[in-house]
Amino acid sequence: MKYIRTLSLLILSVLAGAVAPAVAADKETSRVLCLDGRDNNVRTGIGLMAAPWTLELWVQSDAARRGRREMLIAGGEYSSLSWVDNEALALVDGRLTATAARLTAPDTLDGAWHHVALVCDGRSVALHMDGRLLARRDTAYTILPGTIGVGEEDGTFTGSIDEVRIWTAAVSPRTLKRWAGRSLSPSHPDYAHLYAYYPLDDFDGETAVNWVGRGFRPFHLRNCRNKWRESAPLAYARPSDNARMRPYDDRQRLFNAVVQRSEWDCDRGSSDCQILKLRLAVQGSRRPMRLTGLTLSLDSTADLSDVAAVHVYATGQKALSGRRTPLFGGSHKPARRLQLATGGSDGLTLEPGINYVLVTFDIAPGATVGHRLWADVLSYELDGHTYRPEPPAATVAQEVTTRNALDGDYLKVLQWNIWHGGVHLADSGRHRVISLLREAKADVVLMQEAYGIQQMAARATGYRMKSKSDGDNLALFTSLPMEDSIPWREPFKSNPAIVTMRCGHRVVVNSLWLRYAYRPEYTCYYPEVGGNPARWVHEDSLLALPDIRNLIENDVEPYLRPGMSAVVGGDFNACSHLDWTARAARFHHGYGPVAFPASLYMQQAGYHDSFRTVHPDETLRPEGTWAVIYGQTPYGRIDFVHSKGALRPVQSKIIRMMPEIDAPWPGDHAATLSVFRVAEK
């Protein structure tokens, strides 16, 4: 039983489907992405891609309404790097253009559907349309395909897009032509190099799944606006009218099976903590397949007694469907190996598109804080035949964590910059933010860029709240008794209060925001070559450093009485010397060590960086907080939770995925969730 057997099944399915011509799918189920040229902002989040690569998609330009310069695949925000092409494929005056290669189609696009591709093999770049080579030039370069249909802030495409395929290989002209009008399958000769695949039939106004996406950054589409204060129409989907693209709708076949893990820790005594999802991507509706078995390994769970029960559910075709249908008989006693089968029942009938299967744990009330929780999908069965999923991406292990009502000497603190009030994910971003707050179950939430969500979040969670106004930058939420006797001096930068833990320990807490370096804005553009870290340090010494010194010396230290502790956290808009070391320079484009002054000040003032205290090796845990949604900057940690006094950090995690596995992230910053314990005297 090997992974290759899945591929064998799929190839046989393709051959079987070749006996009779495929019938075009119902146009109501085959959909395309529509952009209106105004303020659509559809992001993939994909980062830097060195040659070889291929960009491939179907386009239908609105010739009557299009602008002079429109992007098809580009970099999006913060993508302007001198050595990178962030406008890979565009329309300039209606003509297909690869700017960096100086390639332009001879004719303007009409209003018909066209298959277009840009291919770089490491030596040359070629522009193709409808199976014809339009132009070629001897050159090679790195691209940043972070958006579909929009540039850094403008250049929105006017028209429709379908079947976006991004490859880490140079797809041959023959293969491009042969597969242009066909749905992809694992029999494609470059299938192993498929980096992103958006059929777009599942686009729901908020997101569309990257069928090959894996890990904490699966590059699912995120639908939003650039002008966040405005309300221009979002990109949307409509039934396809592309007669040249014939989706597969014959005997059902499996495209792939991907395991997506959660990184969220599980509270002691909690039920149905999400551990993983098996994402089954299926094509075709004739003779649908059934999931009839699942084999799980719990070998990497530290102690099986921490797990009270294991559950498996079918959760529908959307990550956020809300559906949970028990599979394989409901609850199961944990074991190192769990072989689950339908036991004569029909099993889960798979639907065309994405199908999710969720594995959850009930955590024992007496589970040990810090113990590892883990499950592997060893195999799954379709109609009684056994296959293995694709190897999962590396993720941070889940652990048992505290439960507020049970552990009075623990303090759980969530810090998060939610990005402009949480409005950057379609029209549902604020609801996604609140769902994360509920799931985190933090005692204290230190929020930045709250901008209007304050009252909505307080009502939804039941938290006490302190904010200068409902439209202000900073907000502080807590489930604990709170004294707001500390006055505001600079409410845009500092929001202090005092909370009393369940054990009686009093803590000064502060949600803060510091000014950022902008000459240059190194936290966003550190992938640039030829950077000068001394200049970054100088800028921070003029902005972030005086801000943090002012806030600590005036809004925290004067209110620390004997026996009290302090927890301060927020968006420092500056990196840490603890991360940017010589050993970790490979994560930061060769830069390091860098003596960032704000983090050095906190260390010298006696404050402990909770994440780096718990994870002292910066090469083993290099995660960043800015930005989760931009693949070119994965290791910029600029958000921190620091402590001082009797509180000691015992757990800390960068939260970079939603509690609901495989759902889109609503912000740009990751969150930081740290657990502290009052030290014994």
Briefly describe each language-model feature range:
Residues 22-38, 177-240:
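Extracytoplasmic low-complexity segments
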